[in-house]
């Protein structure tokens, strides 16, 4: 399987649209046709499910979560999962207009946090079922023990004050494990 998280940052389309022109929809079609993951899948002649996830800054994490679900459900033995994003004018100006960017280093869990820092990057993980790795004689570098994602629908931008959605996501991610046994948490910490 192949799953990639990404965002669409096509400035030419946006500029033409803002000028009242009828922009070429090729960029939108490329994006809607799930371009990144199918490209990787075709290039490597892979079989299995293919998905491109567009969920803003959570896309890469959600791609990894989907990979874990595919393996747990027996759809795949091995999944290439990753995420990519670029800094471009549209998201930069959007976040800047919300006055939630910071000139200081990002400190998402600090009481004195004052905003986010935009950046760009990409990362890919090869996620494989334990039985498949053992058959191939591969020693895993890490184990993905769980994944949790929850939208509590309390408010458009604010979570439920009691943390119901957060608790549900944490329980999903812990997957029945003791929190003391967890060595790494990939948290969505924007510092806003």
Predicted regions and their residues:
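Condensing-enzyme catalytic core mediating Claisen C-C bond formation in acyl metabolism
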Residues: 101, 105-184
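Conserved small-residue
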Residues: 2, 40, 60, 67, ...
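Short coil-to-beta-strand
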Residues: 1-8, 38, 140-146
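Acidic, glycine-rich active-site loops and adjacent beta-strand->loop/helix elements
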Residues: 6-8, 55-59, 83-88, 146-151, ...
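Short, intrinsically disordered, charge-balanced linker/junction segments flanking boundaries
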Residues: 13-16, 187-192
């Amino acid at each position: 399987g192949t799953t990639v998280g990404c965002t669409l940052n096509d400035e030419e389309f946006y500029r033409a649209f803002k000028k009242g022109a009828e922009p070429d929809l090729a960029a939108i079609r490329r994006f809607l046709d799930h371009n990144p993951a199918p490209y990787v899948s075709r290039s490597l002649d892979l079989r299995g499910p293919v998905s491109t996830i567009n969920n803003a800054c959570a896309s890469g994490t959600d791609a990894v979560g989907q990979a874990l679900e595919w393996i747990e459900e027996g759809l795949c033995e091995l999944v290439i999962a990753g995420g990519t994003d670029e800094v471009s004018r549209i998201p930069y100006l959007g976040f800047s207009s919300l006055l939630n960017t910071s000139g200081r280093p990002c400190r998402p869990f600090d009481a004195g946090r004052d905003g986010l820092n935009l950046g760009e990057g990409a990362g890919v993980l090869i996620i494989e079922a334990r039985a498949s790795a053992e058959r191939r004689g591969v020693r895993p570098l890490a184990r993905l023990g769980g994944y949790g994602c929850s939208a509590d629908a309390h408010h458009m931008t604010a979570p439920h004050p009691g943390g119901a959605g957060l608790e549900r996501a944490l329980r999903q991610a812990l997957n029945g494990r003791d929190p003391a046994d967890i060595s790494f948490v990939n948290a969505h910490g924007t510092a806003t």
